[in-house]
Amino acid sequence: MAGPELLLDSNIRLWVVLPIVIITFFVGMIRHYVSILLQSDKKLTQEQVSDSQVLIRSRVLRENGKYIPKQSFLTRKYYFNNPEDGFFKKTKRKVVPPSPMTDPTMLTDMMKGNVTNVLPMILIGGWINMTFSGFVTTKVPFPLTLRFKPMLQQGIELLTLDASWVSSASWYFLNVFGLRSIYSLILGQDNAADQSRMMQEQMTGAAMAMPADTNKAFKTEWEALELTDHQWALDDVEEELMAKDLHFEGMFKKELQTSIF
């Protein structure tokens, strides 16, 4: 038999639930713009820019090579894929994996990430836990087992309380992870306000992702270009153009009116 249902004071909604939602939302907005101010542009070397342009040229050749004559296509393909001295065959780049302990730029980016992500969560979470501690804020609309009590009822030590009720501290963390769609709607998909995404990147190491291996990119592009054959798309363009009724007769029958001043 279920126990009596709890009735929450309406002031809890006004002075606890809504303030936590508003504070969490604006902290995320501030974090987004602070991250924009603190982010540093990654400097590219001349070699990296040149390699990226070569890959773009090869991809354009694969996609639009059908609009140039076959000899021109084969000449460009020979430049890239010649087995002896083709660009993708002879060019070998030295890939040096960066070390965060020796690269001051990576250390600076890590510190900026901690300042904009970890520090606000600790400060705001501690302040909310101290200010709004002990409140039962809301209830999830489905029953839960007792295993969810430590996650949803932080700061409330009531063994007889149903696990579906949410404490104020847990309500803050639910907002941290639940406002992702709101941030994407207002700030766009790639925003710095999504604290849960930033936490996942730091835990998985995506924030310090290794740069792409240029040699592997060259090999992949070489294989793709090697499988590309020339299919002349303008083979019968003259016949198709002459077969179309372009209605030129009306253009030469119009009299041009001139005025003499």
From Swiss-Prot:
It holds the Pfam family EMC3_TMCO1. One of its GO terms (cellular component) is membrane. GO terms for biological process: protein insertion into ER membrane by stop-transfer membrane-anchor sequence; tail-anchored membrane protein insertion into ER membrane. Keywords: Endoplasmic reticulum, Membrane, Transmembrane, Transmembrane helix. It is found in: Endoplasmic reticulum membrane. The chain crosses the membrane at residues 15-38, 115-130, 169-187. The keyword Electron transport does not apply. The keyword Transmembrane applies. Disulfide bonds: none annotated. InterPro entries: EMC3, EMC3/TMCO1. It is a multi-pass membrane protein. Signal peptide: none annotated. Changing residue 180 to K: No effect on EMC assembly and no effect on membrane insertion of hydrophobic transmembrane helices-containing proteins by the EMC. Residues 39-114, 188-261 are cytoplasmic. Changing residue 173 to A: No effect on EMC assembly and no effect on membrane insertion of hydrophobic transmembrane helices-containing proteins by the EMC. Residues 2-14, 131-168 are lumenal. Part of the endoplasmic reticulum membrane protein complex (EMC) that enables the energy-independent insertion into endoplasmic reticulum membranes of newly synthesized membrane proteins. Preferentially accommodates proteins with transmembrane domains that are weakly hydrophobic or contain destabilizing features such as charged and aromatic residues. Involved in the cotranslational insertion of multi-pass membrane proteins in which stop-transfer membrane-anchor sequences become ER membrane spanning helices. Belongs to the EMC3 family. Component of the ER membrane protein complex (EMC). This is ER membrane protein complex subunit 3. It comes from Homo sapiens (Human).
